[in-house]
């Protein structure tokens, strides 16, 4: 009997539990809410909102307002100074550094001990449970897992708190037993210089029996390329012949899938998506033949949803899980044991099923183009690019897009800045196909493109090699959970990138 068969027995009871939970998700959610409310009564925030008198979801929704980071920032700042019982009972030592708001360079998301145990680590364990259920002949524990994390700093001039990328916090606090099946060593994993880190990871993993890898697709790809360079091999499965799964999250995998398939040729390779963020762990791909993810309903996370059609209303409709419908684009709202109360996380999702509750990430509440009523979201962009790439034998490495509100000819259009790993057979044809497919999948975009009256044909600017890497490096944002903003209603980001893109060539 191999080691995976032995270790796998520890996950059997949870596999059965998850199967039963799929049928009782709503009841589980109300249990979660009751438990969080009970804990919240013992906090300053709970007393402020009279949580001791809240017994039902309706009372909860009436007592606590919807919150953004700015709304909770004052309380979080006090927690970081060491004050206790503010948003969550006791003191919270760890804070996950996340991309900033309009007013601040960074957000510092509290990560309580309860949140680590009952959200983040529970999610990691369930990934393994669901993977082993999908792949019963797995041998993943016969080797080691490469976990690609960010870095953490001991403070940000605040002596009572520790700050870092979520992945670094998880590595720092992980059960010591996990270190026996994990690489690289902690010192390497927590390095802040990503370019040094990836070289060291490559050196440390050569000759190791790596069976599974975990991380953000863009940064992991960079590490794997370095592994190939150091090993002088052409495929990863020549270096690690027993590699079998990539647990990925953070950004959409679709633009990177082809590149992974080119460097990992093994027919036994699997890809499993997760939805984890600084704010919590929310979804796992429970069926490898279905790209949707299962909403994890028995963690310390209570979910609510705002239809995006109402998101910018003064008083939008907010619904609990039992009120969602398939195919509607929702902004997600969470209440967690990390002290996030009715927190608008900034992601949008669409349910593909409600029995069980399965969904796909569709984008960000602030990452879209709606300059002319076209309501283009990331899900549209990813599908449009995939369609154009397939038809023109192209591969996209990175991209961003923004509107051109009016050029010298008084024309409005969308401008796409795209870095290719494989250039299209015909860039003009690629551009036409992208524009065509966006119209096919987005009726609002189609209406605005009608006869070129409101919107002209989109424009593609070809990015030079490593443009986006160099731009992120200039911002000090290599590695970890940093990512390129895909869609933006404003031109600030794309203008910065265009300035970096010397000798770029505009294609129609």
Task: Go through each PLM region and give its residues.
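Short, basic alpha-helical nucleic acid-contact segments in DNA-binding proteins
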Residues: 123-128, 289
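Active-site glycine/GP-rich loop and adjacent strand/helix microenvironment
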Residues: 1-52, 60-67, 75-78, 82, ...
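Short coil/turn connectors at secondary-structure junctions
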Residues: 105, 141-143, 242-243, 269
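Conserved AMP-binding loop of ANL adenylate-forming enzymes
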Residues: 129-178
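Non-catalytic, beta-rich accessory domains that mediate macromolecular interactions or localization
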Residues: 84-85, 104-115, 238, 245, ...
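Conserved helicase ATPase motor motifs in RecA-like P-loop NTPase domains
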Residues: 96-102
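Active-site diphosphate/adenylate-binding microenvironment
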Residues: 27, 31-95, 106-111, 118, ...
């Amino acid at each position: 009997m191999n080691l995976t068969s032995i270790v796998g027995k520890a996950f059997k009871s949870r596999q059965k539990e998850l199967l039963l939970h799929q049928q009782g998700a709503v009841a589980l959610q109300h249990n979660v809410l009751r438990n969080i409310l009970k804990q919240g009564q013992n906090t300053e925030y709970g007393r402020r909102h009279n949580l001791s008198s809240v017994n039902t979801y309706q009372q909860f929704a009436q007592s606590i307002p919807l919150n953004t980071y700015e709304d909770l920032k004052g309380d979080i700042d006090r927690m970081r100074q060491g004050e206790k019982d503010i948003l969550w009972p006791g003191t919270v030592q760890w804070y996950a550094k996340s991309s900033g708001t309009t007013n601040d360079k960074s957000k510092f998301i509290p990560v309580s001990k309860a949140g680590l145990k009952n959200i983040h680590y529970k999610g990691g364990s369930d990934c393994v449970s669901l993977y082993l259920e999908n792949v019963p002949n797995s041998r993943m524990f016969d080797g080691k897992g490469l976990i690609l994390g960010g870095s953490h700093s001991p403070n940000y001039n605040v002596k009572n708190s520790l700050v870092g990328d979520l992945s670094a916090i998880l590595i720092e606090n992980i059960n010591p037993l996990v270190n026996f099946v994990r690489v690289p060593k902690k010192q390497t994993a927590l390095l802040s210089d990503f370019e040094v880190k990836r070289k060291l990871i490559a050196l440390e993993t050569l000759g190791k029996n790596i069976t599974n890898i975990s991380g953000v697709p863009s940064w992991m790809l960079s590490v794997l390329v370095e592994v190939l360079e150091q090993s002088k091999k052409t495929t990863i499965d020549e270096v690690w012949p027993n590699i079998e799964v990539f647990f990925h999250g953070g950004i959409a995998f679709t633009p990177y899938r082809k590149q992974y398939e080119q460097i990992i040729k093994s027919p036994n390779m699997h890809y499993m998506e997760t939805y984890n963020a600084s704010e919590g762990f929310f979804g796992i791909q429970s069926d490898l033949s279905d790209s949707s993810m299962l909403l994890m309903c028995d963690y310390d996370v209570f979910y609510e949803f705002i239809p995006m059609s109402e998101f910018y209303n003064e008083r939008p409709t907010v619904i609990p899980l039992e009120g969602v419908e398939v195919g509607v684009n929702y902004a997600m709202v969470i209440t967690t044991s990390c002290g996030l109360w009715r927190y608008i996380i900034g992601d949008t999702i669409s349910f593909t099923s409600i029995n069980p509750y399965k969904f796909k990430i569709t984008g960000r509440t602030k990452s879209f183009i709606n300059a002319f009523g076209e309501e283009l979201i990331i899900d549209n962009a990813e599908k449009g690019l995939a369609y154009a790439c397939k038809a023109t034998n192209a591969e996209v490495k990175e991209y961003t897009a923004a509107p051109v509100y009016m050029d010298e000819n008084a024309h409005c259009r969308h401008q796409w800045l795209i870095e290719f790993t494989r250039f299209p057979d015909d860039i003009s044809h690629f551009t036409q196909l992208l524009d065509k497919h966006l119209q096919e999948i987005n009726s609002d975009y189609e209406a605005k493109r009608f006869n070129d009256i409101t919107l002209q044909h989109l424009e593609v600017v070809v990015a030079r090699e490593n443009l986006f890497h160099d731009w992120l490096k200039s911002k000090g944002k290599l590695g970890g959970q940093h990512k390129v903003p895909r869609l933006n209603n404003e031109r600030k980001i794309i203008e910065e990138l265009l300035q970096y893109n010397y000798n770029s060539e505009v294609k129609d």
